């Protein structure tokens, strides 16, 4: 999907279309590297983000004041989110209270998914912006991140992660941890 997105950026007609496609591209990466809900990503402001060094992961993006379903929490984004944040700061004219992603590119994402032949998954489920959160959760499970850690970062319960995601993990996915 990212490869198709990069091609669409190259083929953009005009500065505005290129900017919108870059924003969508970065929205996808940011979402997959934070596990945040779509509405949480769309509500994130520049002032909420701080880059932090971590011995294990390298650079992380700490996102404060994330208002989720049940509470306000802090989210830790992986290095991909750091890179997106740095690109957004460089590319966009912004103030601390401005949103990272001031608009939802729903139609653009649907077009991209269709062009990439990825609008539905192998089970026939429709993909959309919420799918990036699921991708984050599945990647973290496959990398051996404890369910409680994933749940805390995503603003979910361990039960939800176990019930809806962990059931898809196979022994092959866990070879390195076993």
Describe each PLM feature range:
Residues 6-7, 53-54, 90-95, 163, ...:
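C-terminal secondary-structure termini that scaffold catalytic or DNA-interacting sites
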Residues 66-70, 154-178:
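Catalytic-site neighborhood detector that most strongly recognizes the C-terminal catalytic loop/helix
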Residues 23, 36-37, 67, 74, ...:
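Short, cationic motifs built from Arg/Lys/His that form the positively charged side of catalytic pockets
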Residues 1-38, 42:
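Basic, Lys/Arg- and aromatic-enriched nucleic-acid-binding interface segment
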Residues 21-25, 102-106, 121-144, 154, ...:
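Short basic/aromatic active-site micro-motif
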Residues 65-87, 92-115, 128:
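C-terminal catalytic core of Y-nucleophile DNA break-rejoin enzymes
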Residues 44, 108, 112, 153, ...:
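Residues in the recognition helix of alpha-helical DNA-binding motifs
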Residues 48-56, 126, 145-164:
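Short, polar N-cap/turn motifs at the start of nucleic acid-interacting alpha helices
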